[in-house]
């Protein structure tokens, strides 16, 4: 199954993959070679740590390659949804209880990072937003309780 992902998200994953392959993998190979040179491998903590790190890096490389091969890349800048909220939209919300504004972009599950304002398409927040427009009110059931928001702005920024 294809997983939707923004162009920016795909670039970030490709950059990480390239870094792992061209920088981290050679570093670990050198660390293993150095540790081997120290002799007995049974009690060589450096060797075992380097092998463990190699295993982690190789696993992450495989994971990234798999994610990228299943990504359906969506160029947010080319979307023409107007003020309607769809995948890729950057939405400004006003909390009707506190008047605080927050801004989120709806992205694929693999690129979500709430600290950066990136919410997964499958999240309760995104599900409540999809199909809404500027001026609409949404209700989100959060762990802290029920929150009501107004959609202040909808943008499509790449």
Curated annotation (Swiss-Prot):
It comes from the Bacteria. PROSITE patterns: GREAB_1. Gene3D superfamilies: Transcription elongation factor, GreA/GreB, C-terminal domain, Transcription elongation factor, GreA/GreB, N-terminal domain. GO terms for molecular function: DNA binding; RNA polymerase binding. Disulfide bonds: none annotated. Keywords: Coiled coil, DNA-binding, Transcription, Transcription regulation. InterPro entries: GreA/GreB_C_sf, TF_GreA/GreB_CS, Tscrpt_elong_fac_GreA, Tscrpt_elong_fac_GreA/B, Tscrpt_elong_fac_GreA/B_C, Tscrpt_elong_fac_GreA/B_fam, Tscrpt_elong_fac_GreA/B_N, Tscrpt_elong_fac_GreA/B_N_sf. Residues 45-72 form a coiled coil. GO terms for biological process: DNA-templated transcription elongation; regulation of DNA-templated transcription elongation. Transmembrane segments: none annotated. Necessary for efficient RNA polymerase transcription elongation past template-encoded arresting sites. The arresting sites in DNA have the property of trapping a certain fraction of elongating RNA polymerases that pass through, resulting in locked ternary complexes. Cleavage of the nascent transcript by cleavage factors such as GreA or GreB allows the resumption of elongation from the new 3'terminus. GreA releases sequences of 2 to 3 nucleotides. Belongs to the GreA/GreB family. This is Transcription elongation factor GreA.
């Amino acid at each position: 199954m294809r997983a939707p992902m923004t162009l920016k998200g795909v670039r970030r994953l490709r950059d990480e993959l390239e870094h792992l392959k061209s920088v981290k993998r050679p570093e670990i190979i050198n660390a293993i070679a150095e540790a081997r040179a120290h002799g007995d491998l049974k009690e060589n903590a450096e060797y075992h740590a380097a092998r463990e790190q190699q295993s982690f890096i190789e696993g992450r490389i495989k994971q990234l390659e798999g994610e990228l091969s299943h990504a359906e890349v969506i160029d947010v800048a080319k979307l023409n949804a107007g003020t309607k909220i769809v995948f890729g939209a950057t939405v400004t919300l006003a909390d009707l209880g506190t008047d605080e504004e927050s801004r989120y972009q709806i992205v694929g599950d693999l690129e979500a990072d709430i600290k950066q304002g990136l919410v997964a398409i499958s999240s309760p927040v995104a599900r409540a937003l999809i199909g809404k427009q500027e001026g609409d009110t949404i209700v989100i059931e959060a762990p802290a309780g029920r929150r009501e928001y107004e959609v202040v702005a909808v943008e499509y920024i790449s």
